[in-house]
Structure formats: C-alpha cells, structure tokens
C-alpha cells in the first residue's frame, strides 16, 4: 500500500509538472490586427491597422511567466484611404521601404489567475528602440474547436510618442505625437 501511495503521488507530481511547463503559441495572422489611433491637428482622430503580423508567445500560466516576440509588417498599414496609406508608408512617416518591420520583444508580467496583465519590453520602430509597456485588458484561452489546440486571445492597449521613434510629421501643424495602440491578438498553441 505504501508503494502504491508513492506511485500515486509521483504520478500526480508528474502530471502537475507537465501542466506547468511553458507552452509556445504562434500568432494567428488571420485574427491579429495591431490598430492605432492618431491625432489630426486636434480636429479628429485618424484610425488604421496593420494587416500582417507574426510572432510567438511562450507562457507558463501556473508559474506566471512568459515572453512575447512580435513582428509587424509596416507595408501592411491601412488607414482606409489609398492616398493616406501611400503618404504614411513614405518619407513623412513610416518610411517602410527603409524600415519594413516593427518589432516588439518583451516579457509577460502581472499574472492574475493565470492571465498576464501586461507585457513589458522594447519596441523597435522606424530604426529606433524604446521601452514600451502593453496593458492587457482582456485575456482568455480556450480549446479551439477546429484546431483541437489551445487558442489564447487578448485585447492590448498602449500609448507611444511617435516623435521618440523619429516620426514627428505634422508636429508643426499641431498634431499630437501621442499614438494609441489597440491590438487584438490571437495565438494558437504550437504543435
């Protein structure tokens, strides 16, 4: 009986340890759209999104640890107006021919009940790298009904100063340099 108890305890420990292992997730590009809101001379707010992004998330929800490594294709920016898209990709703003990618790399922090509340790291954008904290307002994981793997999603918010990234276009006309990031992201557990 004593041996049986030890085996049961060992099996329980092994199961717990297996569940606590970090899980890697791949960003689902068909459900991930980094969006942004930027001031237009204090008159209105312009909104746009990036249609192509990729990356990985590694997370151990029991231990409350994780990492994020995301790349955004700056040529996929879309304001909903072709002329504005062309201007934004040009020398006045993104210079996407010279700086085709934005890259966020950081750690997941502030876990509550297995859910991260922020990602703290650096954003490389337009050839400049600055610290950025992304606030995770909503986070949930489910068993994906079609892929039969865990699928996690989040709504993420942050504000950056685009002048710190070398993009002060319009400042002389009264444009605010603050850009609000609104990111919907989904990531599926790697096979």
What is each of the regions a protein language model found here?
Residues 20-191:
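Low-complexity, acidic/polar, glycine-enriched regions of mature
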